[in-house]
Structures are given as structure tokens and as C-alpha cells.
Design a protein with these regions (language model features):
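Conserved Rossmann-fold NAD(P)-dependent oxidoreductase catalytic core, especially the SDR/UDP-sugar
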Residues: 31, 39, 77-135, 140-149
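Structural motif
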Residues: 7, 69-70, 110
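NAD(P)H-binding glycine-rich loop region in Rossmannoid oxidoreductase-like domains
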Residues: 40-98, 102-105, 203
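N-terminal Rossmann NAD(P)H-binding glycine-rich loop of SDR-like oxidoreductase domains
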Residues: 4-28
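Flexible, glycine-rich beta-alpha linker
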Residues: 149-178
Length: 227
């Protein structure tokens, strides 16, 4: 089956996930435009179009989203942790809400949002910010033509993000115990390769249902393979 060539607008394209995703999309023949801050274009992979704007303010870039059919929101606090509540409030929440507004104003058909696995016993403020964006996405899908895919990883293991590997034996044990099995699956680790594969799949195969977003939890993300 011949895949349709997608026109993808990405916020957060210079980050841990963004650069690799752009490379993967370009290699598969898709058109990619990335939002960057002033002076940030040097960190983008070659071959990508870019515009300068503020990811926290939809009015700074919404007019540049068209003719994209897909908007991918990847902006967030680097290396999120329990002590970064203020950053989640100032960056993760407004950037997510701005992406929804930009998608609507740009008449994008499909919004792809990377949220976080939930519920969880820690990272409450991070989950709160991401959940608020999910709520806004559901509202937008219910009131417009917009479709959405929400991916909920817990931790993406890859270059510079590998410390949770030491927890793998504990995850293996937790998956075997009935009372911890569901939580271990929901809060499991995914690799950087799996995350990029899942994002590419989501972009290339948008949902048909316009009544609400589809949600991919950790087990579904883990099925992703490098393009």
C-alpha cells in the first residue's frame, strides 16, 4: 500500500524526540516544518523548513501552520522531575494549549500530542499539566473537525536518558505479580526507537474517528519500530 505523503508541523523539533522524528519523517518522504526560537534553527536536521516563533503563544505561529495536515506537539520541560512543578506550569501546560489553538486556527486535521502515563504515584504536577492539555484536546475534537492521537509514555530510554535501565529487574518482577501487573505495564519503559516508530505510525495512519482522540498507552507505544 502506498502511503500518503504527509505535511507535518512540529513544535519541539530540536529536542530529544523531535530531531529523530524529523529525520525519520524526511527519510520517508514527508514534508516537515518546525517551529524554533530565534537562533534555534542550527539545531534542526538538514532538509527541514522552519519558522521562528514562541511555542507558548499560538498567535506567534498559527498563521504559518497551513498547509500542514498534521501538527505534532513535543515542547516540554527537559528531563522532567518532581522538583520542576513551576516549569511544568510555565512551559508544558501553555505550550500544549497553544498547540491545540494553532491546530484549530491552521485547520489541521490531525494533532499528535505526547502526554504522560497516568495515573502514577509520583510526578503529580507533571501529570496535572499534561492532563489539562488532554482535556482541551478532547474539547476541541468534540467541537470541530480535529482528530487527535495522544501518546502516553512514562520514560523514554535513549541517549542521555538511560538511568531507568537499572530498574528493569524490578519491572520484570512487578509484571509477574497480580497486584502490580497493571501498573508495571502502564508505567513501563519504552525505547527511543520505539517512541519514534510509534510517532511515525501515528502520523502516517491518523484516526478516522472524529468523536474523540485515540490514546496509545505504553504497551501500544512499545510496538513501535524504527522506520
Amino acid at each position: 500500500m502506498t502511503l500518503r505523503r504527509r505535511h507535518v508541523f512540529i513544535t519541539g523539533g530540536t529536542g530529544y524526540i523531535g530531531r529523530a522524528l524529523i529525520d525519520a519523517l524526511l527519510s520517508r518522504g514527508h514534508i516537515v516544518r518546525a517551529l524554533v526560537r530565534s537562533g534555534g534553527s542550527a539545531r534542526l536536521p538538514p532538509g527541514v523548513e522552519y519558522i521562528v516563533g514562541n511555542a507558548l503563544d499560538a498567535t506567534s505561529y498559527a498563521s504559518e501552520v497551513a498547509p500542514a495536515d498534521t501538527l505534532v506537539q513535543l515542547v516540554g520541560t527537559p528531563h522532567p522531575g518532581p522538583g520542576k512543578t513551576e516549569q511544568f506550569r510555565r512551559v508544558d501546560l501553555p505550550s500544549g494549549l497553544a498547540a491545540v489553538d494553532a491546530a484549530l486556527k491552521g485547520k489541521v486535521r490531525h494533532l499528535v500530542y505526547v502526554s504522560v502515563a497516568q495515573p502514577a504515584p509520583v510526578m503529580k504536577s507533571y501529570i496535572l499539566a499534561r492532563s489539562a492539555v488532554e482535556t482541551r484536546i478532547r474539547e476541541a475534537c468534540g467541537q470541530s473537525w480535529l482528530t487527535a492521537t495522544i501518546l502516553r509514555p512514562w520514560y523514554v530510554v535513549g541517549p542521555g536518558h538511560s538511568w531507568p535501565v537499572v530498574l528493569k529487574p524490578l519491572y520484570s518482577l512487578a509484571r509477574k505479580l497480580p497486584w502490580t501487573r497493571d501498573g508495571a505495564r502502564r508505567l513501563g519503559l519504552v525505547t527511543h526507537e520505539q517512541m519514534i516508530g510509534a510517532l511515525v505510525e501515528a502520523i502516517e495512519h491518523p484516526p478516522d474517528d472524529v468523536t474523540g482522540p485515540r490514546v496509545w498507552e505504553v504497551p501500544r507505544i512499545a510496538q513501535g519500530r524504527a522506520p
